[in-house]
Amino acid sequence: MSNTNFCSDTLLDYLYTQTLPTPLPPDYTKDDFSKWQIKKRNEVQDLLRIQELSNLLSVPVSAQLIEQFYTDDVLIEKYCLQGIRHLNTPLFIAGANNPASKSILYLHGHDKFGIQGALKHLEASPYHKYLPLLLAKEGYRVYAPEMIGFGEAHKQHYDMGNSKEGSCFPNGTQLLASGFSLAGLRSFQAMKIVDFMKQQNAETISVFGISGGGMGAMYLSACDSRIDHMILSGYPCTWPDTLFVHHHCIDNFVPGMTRIADGPQIISLFAPKPLLLLTGKTDHVFALSGAQKAFSVVREAYQIFDCPHQLQSFVFDGGHETAPELVIPWFRDRCK
């Protein structure tokens, strides 16, 4: 009897497997892996169109202070950051009176309040747990930008309603039609914020990314060698275990991305620098099974460099959220 199954699954899986990049041979050396990292970093930057974005949009970085306020006794300054032609970035600095030498870039995920859900007592998404404020109280200067598509940085005249996805969809579709992507533009945006952090005399730069901000941190670390430490929370996972089986925002997708590498392999480009990976046991967005596979892939990279101590990974009791009780001690040990 002929096959009368009209579903698309087999076709999609076939195309995915047929376009996967060639894996490293089983007997690869540390030197082989280092060369692979260089190659993949270049491929990721090409995928995100970083050089083209820079050619089209880069202008000198400057910032204008527009507001100061306190939340839980933490001084927060709001700046209008310029560095991208035709795009101003709302940038909040929590612990603005703390020394610039201890600087953390905090990249948020989807929240109907944008970054302000992590900085003000609003009806906020619980996954932030006000971590920027807690880190500021530890003496860090926390740079918390509102990335394009969220909060104030939305597409004008687009009715976001109560959606936590902000205006990602209209931004993302127009960028895709022009050959760009939200992931690429946000990576370039984050690199401009790092430029500003360096202007502020940041000696070391750490990046923390939660959920979609984890994707941003992952791509940033592959594009910008100035990142010294990284924490990914509620994001590390194999793409087939999350992006292909659940509804996800358009900002997760870049045409051709699976031809370059899977997410855990891109995270591995950060080796041998200090890295912390976190996932909640009951995370419904980035499944535990896929997260554990991701941990294993990244662990191999650190073993190749003979520095397994530089990587820590934890499964904590919780869902799609972060774990300040793990994040804060990790920063204390590494960012003194």
Where are these predicted regions, by residue range?
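C-terminal catalytic histidine-bearing segment of alpha/beta-hydrolase fold enzymes
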Residues: 296-336
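N-terminal targeting or regulatory segments adjacent to alpha/beta-hydrolase or S9 domains
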Residues: 1-75, 83, 117
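Short beta-strand element of the alpha/beta-hydrolase
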Residues: 91, 101-111
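A short loop-to-beta-strand scaffold at the N-terminal edge of the catalytic core in hydrolase folds
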Residues: 76-78, 85-95
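Short beta-strand/loop motif that positions the catalytic acidic residue
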Residues: 270, 277-279
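Mobile cap/lid helix-loop segments that gate and shape the active-site cleft of serine hydrolases
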Residues: 177-180, 227-267, 285-294, 304-307
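Primarily recognizes the serine-hydrolase "nucleophile elbow" in alpha/beta-hydrolase
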Residues: 185-259
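Cap/lid segment of the alpha/beta-hydrolase catalytic domain
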Residues: 107-188, 242-244
